[in-house]
Amino acid sequence: MKVNNQWIRGIWSDDGGKTVCFPDQTKLPYQLEICREGTSDALIRAIKTMQVRGAPLIGAAGAWAAAFLCREAKTEEALQKGLKRIAEARPTAVNLQWAVRRVASAAEGLSGDVRAARAQKAAEEICESDIESNRAIGGYFASVIEETYRKNGRPVRILTHCNAGWLATVDYGTALSGLYVAQEQGIPMEVWVDETRPRMQGLLTEWELREAGIPCTLIADNAGGYLMQQGEVDLVIVGADRIASNGDVANKVGTYLKALAANDCGVPFYVAAPVSTVDFSLAEGVESIPVEERSRSEVTEISGIGPDGNVTRVQVAGQDTAVRNIAFDITPARLITGCL
């Protein structure tokens, strides 16, 4: 997508595939800083620290990590150990495991430069496929937005949780791709953006939409239910980190509560995700999808702009405060209007 008149993707290759570049999402929306990495270890670290985040983008970064590993590994044992480390960097987003398997399969039985070239091609194909999938998802959801607009005759009011835009993918996004396509079609919209504690990914969504010229309003996480009760939400659209075979959806913690409120208020609730997010090995998700728990500091500290204009972190809870930082929750399929 365009930022400051410059076209930027969630991740892209450079130097003939020797390195990849990506915006450091731990610095956004305060600073746009582009990272350049060329080793599997560096990309594993970027995935773990959420410099890259969002299930499809984690998958793409994992694909490049696997491709770099195919170039680096001197033995089959080192290759297999490295692939396992990449796949386990984040446990909930199934796209990561899927992408690693696909690159490993493309390079299986090969060695040296041939293996490296085949792995790089697989990583490139995964990235291009992600863009195509997201554009298709955008077309589907744009038709839902258009239908709602024609029915109501006013700007469509959409609520979204976390960030499922181009920052969470290679480009366009999943949940937000429909908004971008609808904007191209001239359909008026107003977007409610959940702040999405504790990592405040809603700030990324607000930044994305503002850069794209789509009207949006940042709200506290717990405000969505009230807005639905008051008839101020026409549609809810979210992304997904893993979808079980029965349609249960793992997504950023808080998604389940939005789905419950939408169900109670009769507001359509949609999930947007590529096929790589579906885990066909799981019959259901509520009891089976592994849910990541992250550092207590994500809850007890928060980033912002200090009086000197620089990004700073402040503590909002004491060191003796008991904390449990659950990163995802599972929304049962019965609460979901449709998966796009």
Regions from the PLM with identified roles:
Residues 95-157, 189, 193-236:
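Ligand-binding beta-strand-loop-alpha-helix segment within the catalytic cores
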Residues 2, 9-113:
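Long amphipathic alpha-helical segments
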Residues 149, 154-176:
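Helix-rich catalytic cores of soluble enzyme domains
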Residues 35-51, 156-160, 309-325:
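Short, hydrophobic/aliphatic alpha-helical segments
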Residues 23, 61, 65, 97, ...:
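Short beta-strand segments
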